[in-house]
């Protein structure tokens, strides 16, 4: 039954349809399977016309399921899906004016590139001259004009993906849905295709919803990113805000490479100053303004989760002198040279942490090295709240823009 539904829906995509607007609205959308498994829970999101929205999260988080519900490949269990001013829960995929690009290219092997791109238009009985114009325009955009006479077997992976995108472009849809389109490509091609997709969005000025598990794709492509875990939205924000002001511990650890260092710490008060004890040897003093926030929040004597990005921990003497209240000593366990930077792995208590430092560092495994943290870039998460729900209330020192999550 699912295979039949899938094939029927894919045929509907090829036949196409039209809408006057490309904005989307998902209101309390849920997906529950017959066995009771909840794949997507209470999904609320407003997508503006011409936005490039990324759904990102680990495997099984519900991102592809949500995309398939938007496409019409999956039935919505409850909630509402609007495209423009029309409720489309029960609208056939062909009438949603949506084009989808999959992880596998799904090209017809016996057809040329031209015929693969033109196939959907031929089914819709579009005049031949219009088909020819649309195919050549899309091929020019994607730089595959010289490939139009070739068969898919004669193409590279990147070229096949361009053809798959071209097949979607010729339909002039209002919304593109892309389900991990680059995951079958090697690392070099992924970088190239990321650039091509970004250019494509700017040129076409259409709405794109893009699913990936790769945070690099998410951060480099999206105007906004939806971070998902266990079918629940964790945060919706711009790439910069996600990185600088994560909404909870999951987002803090998921976004960023190397990931944010997350360490349990006890909050103590000495007069008007607060200290964060991360281990017997690592105690960080906070300035008055930051201390007051934790005191007023009732965190003195409690255990919190402290987050600090690897690039905000340095072994540079000048940096250490400027951040003397946050300096500490640790033994280097692993040294990773990455060309323009070095990752030093060390420990705070029983937690392995990372510092992203200048490649001219002299630190090597086994060395005891003095580090310091930039406390203005420190995040403090409420561990008690973490135990009560999957959504944490952050006590963070940097301002956070409103999130729709």
Describe the function of each predicted region:
Residues 36-38:
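Short coil-to-beta microelement around the adenine-binding A-loop and adjacent beta1/P-loop entry
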Residues 56-58:
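The feature captures the beta-strand-to-loop junction immediately N-terminal to the Walker
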Residues 80, 86-87, 232:
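ATP-binding/catalytic-site motifs of ATP-hydrolyzing domains
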Residues 93-254:
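ABC ATPase nucleotide-binding domains
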Residues 1-5, 392-396, 402:
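Short, small-residue-biased leader/transition segments that mark boundaries at the very start
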Residues 71:
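Helix-to-loop junction immediately C-terminal to a conserved catalytic motif
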Residues 273-332, 362-391:
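Glycine/charge-rich catalytic "coupling/switch" loops of P-loop NTPases
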């Amino acid at each position: 039954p699912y295979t039949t539904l899938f094939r029927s829906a894919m045929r509907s995509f090829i036949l196409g349809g039209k809408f006057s607007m490309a904005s989307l609205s998902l209101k309390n959308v849920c997906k529950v399977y017959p066995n009771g498994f909840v794949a997507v829970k209470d999904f609320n999101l407003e997508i503006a016309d011409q936005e490039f929205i990324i759904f990102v999260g680990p495997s099984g988080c519900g991102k592809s399921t949500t995309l398939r519900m938007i496409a019409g490949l999956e039935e919505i269990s409850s909630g509402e899906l609007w495209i423009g001013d029309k409720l489309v829960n029960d609208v056939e995929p062909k009438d949603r004016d949506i084009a989808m690009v999959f992880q596998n290219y799904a090209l017809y092997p016996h057809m040329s590139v031209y015929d693969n791109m033109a196939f959907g238009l031929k089914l819709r009985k579009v005049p031949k001259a219009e088909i020819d114009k649309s195919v050549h325009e899309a091929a020019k955009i994607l730089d595959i004009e010289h490939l139009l006479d070739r068969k898919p077997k004669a193409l590279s992976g990147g070229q096949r993906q361009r053809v798959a995108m071209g097949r979607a472009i010729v339909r002039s849809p209002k919304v593109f849905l892309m389900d991990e389109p680059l995951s079958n490509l090697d690392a070099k091609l992924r970088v190239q295709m990321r650039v091509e997709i970004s250019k494509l969005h700017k040129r076409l000025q259409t709405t794109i919803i893009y699913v990936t598990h790769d945070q690099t794709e998410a951060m480099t492509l999206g105007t906004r990113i939806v971070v998902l875990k266990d079918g629940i939205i964790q945060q919706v924000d711009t790439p910069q805000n996600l990185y600088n002001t994560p909404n909870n511990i999951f987002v803090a650890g998921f976004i960023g490479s190397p990931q944010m260092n997350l360490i349990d710490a006890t909050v103590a008060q000495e007069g008007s100053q607060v200290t964060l004890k991360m281990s017997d040897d690592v105690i960080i003093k906070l300035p008055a303004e930051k201390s007051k926030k934790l005191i007023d929040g009732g965190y003195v004597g409690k255990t919190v989760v402290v987050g600090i990005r690897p690039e905000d921990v340095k072994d540079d003497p000048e940096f250490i002198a400027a951040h003397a209240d946050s300096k500490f000593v640790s033994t280097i366990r692993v040294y990773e040279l990455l060309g323009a930077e070095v990752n030093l792995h060390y420990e705070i208590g029983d937690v392995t942490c990372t510092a992203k430092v200048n490649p001219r560092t002299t630190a090597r495994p086994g060395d005891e090295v003095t580090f310091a943290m930039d406390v203005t870039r420190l995040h403090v998460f409420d561990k008690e709240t973490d135990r009560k729900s999957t959504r944490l209330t952050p006590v963070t020192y940097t301002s956070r823009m409103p999130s729709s999550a």
